[in-house]
Amino acid sequence: MGSSEQELKAIVKDLGCGPYFLGTYDKRFPGFVSPHKLACAIVNTAGRETGGVHWMAFAWNPRSKTCYLFEPFGFSDQRLKQVYQFEYESLLRRSAIASSPDRCITLEKSTQSVQGPNSAACGLFCCMFLHAFANWPQTPMDHNPTMNLITGVPNSMLNSPQVQPTLRRNQEQLYSFLERHSPYFRSHSAQIRSATSFCHLKNM
């Protein structure tokens, strides 16, 4: 089941990302509207009419001219296309950041897995990343107090029994983080935990 758009918007607001948050979008995300403002969004790999499949987060830092793509499984571009039929190159091309004078931007993409293979918590991990971006826009992927709470593993080991305890611990840290920082999460904790559990996809 995973996270609904309503849940993600409420949690992101609680986390203080409101001034920069453009919203939740399906795969037709129009990109960033201003090349001069900090901005972020949560984007689904599928069309809204499907009910959604997998959440990712995009963020734009105009000072460093860096676009961040946080995808909790750390899939390669090829794997994203293979598994979700999702490509982000056209998204970046049609974004306002591509119209900056020198059109030279840096793309920084997550490459490690922080989410378990059967977990449905992708949207919640995106919220966690956006909290890091809102507070440490120069280093949102790591080396900050929020993302330091979780540990990435090589994507090639995503399904390995060896790393499942680490990935499960990441999800427990995620829930604890949201318990501390989001009143909405606290009020709906049981429901959200059930819909995003570590073994949710295996049990479907």
From Swiss-Prot:
GO terms for cellular component: host cell nucleus; virion component. The record marks 51-52 as: Cleavage. Cleaves viral precursor proteins (pTP, pIIIa, pVI, pVII, pVIII, and pX) inside newly assembled particles giving rise to mature virions. Protease complexed to its cofactor slides along the viral DNA to specifically locate and cleave the viral precursors. Mature virions have a weakened organization compared to the unmature virions, thereby facilitating subsequent uncoating. Without maturation, the particle lacks infectivity and is unable to uncoat. Late in adenovirus infection, in the cytoplasm, may participate in the cytoskeleton destruction. Cleaves host cell cytoskeletal keratins K7 and K18. Interacts with protease cofactor pVI-C; this interaction is necessary for protease activation. It catalyses: Cleaves proteins of the adenovirus and its host cell at two consensus sites: -Yaa-Xaa-Gly-Gly-|-Xaa- and -Yaa-Xaa-Gly-Xaa-|-Gly- (in which Yaa is Met, Ile or Leu, and Xaa is any amino acid). It comes from Human adenovirus C serotype 2 (HAdV-2). Pfam families: Peptidase_C5 (PF00770). This is Protease. It is found in: Virion; Host nucleus. Belongs to the peptidase C5 family. One of its GO terms (biological process) is proteolysis. Its EC number is 3.4.22.39. InterPro entries: Papain-like_cys_pep_sf, Peptidase_C5. Keywords: Autocatalytic cleavage, Disulfide bond, DNA-binding, Host nucleus, Hydrolase, Late protein, Protease, Thiol protease, Virion. All late proteins expressed from the major late promoter are produced by alternative splicing and alternative polyadenylation of the same gene giving rise to non-overlapping ORFs. A leader sequence is present in the N-terminus of all these mRNAs and is recognized by the viral shutoff protein to provide expression although conventional translation via ribosome scanning from the cap has been shut off in the host cell. The keyword Disulfide bond applies. It is an enzyme of class 3 (hydrolase). Requires DNA and protease cofactor for maximal activation. Inside nascent virions, becomes partially activated by binding to the viral DNA, allowing it to cleave the cofactor that binds to the protease and fully activates it. Actin, like the viral protease cofactor, seems to act as a cofactor in the cleavage of cytokeratin 18 and of actin itself. One of its GO terms (molecular function) is cysteine-type peptidase activity. The active site is at 54, 71, 122. Induction: Expressed in the late phase of the viral replicative cycle.
